[in-house]
Amino acid sequence: NFKLTGRYTTDHFSAAFVSPLYDINKQNWSDELNDNIVDLEKLPELVWTDEIIGNITKTASNETGLAEGTIVTSGTIDAAAEAISVGVIGTGDMMMMYGSTMFYILVTDKVLSDKRLWYSPWLFKGEHSSMGGLATSGTLTHWFKNNFAQELTGDDTFIRLAQEAEKSPPGSKGIVFLPYFSGERTPIHDTNAKGTFFGLDLTHNRADMYRSIFEGIAYGTNHVIDVYK
């Protein structure tokens, strides 16, 4: 924002991720903590995501090709922007984002105070968000492919693995998979948690193991949803 407009800003949603430097109750920088860490005037100005913060400067226009004077809004971090793109706008709307990790955003009309989840003001003044996430998802399928399906190549590698997994029955013939291969985020908040395949025996094959990964991620998602309930 500074390079585009000459104004230092960040939105409330992003700032909440550096709580307690950001006071979520006051929706402002924390006077008490920042006095001992950084001068408040050195922190970016807090704005709401949809606020117009300025216009493209002549310098920025020359460097980017964007028209001088173009209006610039605050913007926000990737996950929140993705939530907006799929229609998560008002109270009760929720996004489940599948990627290298899992991320969940639920828009609420009040602060949901639960230490098992994350909280941030939502993108628009007067709204709030409750969030959760798994530390691994797509990273697990890549790990599995790289270690157990190296002979599969090409753009359809993961389609072929998924087709194999479909041949395994629900429950993966008794395999229970814990997806804690990079610790875990919500709701257990344990960086030391470890991933595990439970119940393996000589009757199992690659399809069963791969299906159990899908099911483990699904159970992890359900673990978060149970907290919301």
What does each of the following model-derived ranges do?
Residues E45-E51:
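Core alpha/beta catalytic barrel or barrel-like domain that forms the active/cofactor pocket
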